[in-house]
Amino acid sequence: MTWMVKLLRQMISMQSQYGAALGATCLLHYLTTSLSIRFFFHDLTVRKHEVMPLGMDYYYLYAIGKDPSHPEIRGSVRKILEKYKTKADKANCALALEAISEHARSVYEYFGFKTYLVFQFGVGEVNSKGEPDPQGKGFTAYLMLYHKDADTIFHA
């Protein structure tokens, strides 16, 4: 089983067992023990700091998701994003996240996020749908940032 499949299974398991907050914390631990640590916690951080002004604080929104077995529950992503956008606007700080699909990217764009890095994820482990494939090309992911004054203070 590849690390990506393990990661996705771990995320579903932890979120259904313990709720999203603890699930995300457990996922963070799992992710830091995988081979992707350099990319997620170094390369993406470097790009965030290239875009944002030196010393700018930011909230990192990690593992936002929805349980597909409950399509009747709507608006949870909106509540999370609106709450953190309000906090960030008041504190004059940014929001950062990674979108792992075109759909997620379009949702975040609707809420004012912009893409600052496009990258391939899971190459040689999964196909474009995230299914295990040792010859897989992985899938495209996006580093996205939000700030109320992004157009004037962020460096593209």
UniProtKB/Swiss-Prot annotation:
Keywords: Membrane, Transmembrane, Transmembrane helix
Cellular component GO terms, alphabetical: membrane
Keyword Membrane attached: yes
Superkingdom, natural source: Eukaryota
Keyword Lipoprotein set for record: no
Membrane topology value: Single-pass membrane protein
Main location (coarse class): membrane
Any one GO BP annotation for this protein: mitotic recombination
Residue ranges crossing the lipid bilayer per the database entry: 20-42
Subcellular location: Membrane
Gene3D superfamilies listed in its UniProt record: 3.40.630.30
InterPro entries, per database record: N-acetyltrans/Recomb-assoc
Gene ablation phenotype (knockout): Displays increased levels of spontaneous RAD52 foci in proliferating diploid cells.
PANTHER family: ACETYLTRANSFERASE (PTHR43451:SF1), ACETYLTRANSFERASE (GNAT) FAMILY PROTEIN (PTHR43451)
Note: Partially overlaps YOR012W. Disruption phenotypes caused by deletion of this gene may also be a result of a defect in its overlapping gene.
Protein's name in the database: Putative increased recombination centers protein 11
Organism per entry: Saccharomyces cerevisiae (strain ATCC 204508 / S288c)
Gene giving rise to this polypeptide: IRC11
